[in-house]
Amino acid sequence: MKTNNDCSNDPVLQALQAASDPIRLNILTCLVFNSEKRITSETYNIVKSTLSHHIKMLKDAQLIQEIKIGKTKKYILNQEYIERELPGLLELIRFRAKDQEN
């Protein structure tokens, strides 16, 4: 039985749920303005396991992709997917970031 909280089969709901957390939204905002970025737990003042959870949520929602360079992991936005499945989301994130600057 599917419940209202079951987002696993709906990619739009899964992406919106992933983006709704303040830390994950900040990660997305950072990636909107940086083509690729190494994301560390120190940046967000959280433990590594919590950061791993946030990264997994964003990857599972197909909002970000991981690039491995040696032992280093960097992340990029999955822009093609976002523009196709969630048109307007990148513009909302950009608007939010610019609004917070002012």
Where are each of the predicted segments found?
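A short acidic, leucine-rich amphipathic alpha-helix
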Residues: T40-Y44
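Helix-turn-helix DNA-binding motif, specifically the short coil turn and the N-cap/start of the second
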Residues: V47
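Beta-hairpin "wing" of winged helix-turn-helix
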Residues: K59-G70, I76
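A cross-family signal for key residues in well-ordered alpha-helices
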Residues: Q17, N26-T29, K59, Q65, ...
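Conserved segment of winged-helix/HTH DNA-binding domains
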Residues: T3, S8, V12, L16, ...
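Short capping segments at the starts of secondary-structure elements
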Residues: P22-L25, V32-R38
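Short, hydrophobic-biased segments on the C-terminal half of alpha helices
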Residues: I55-K56
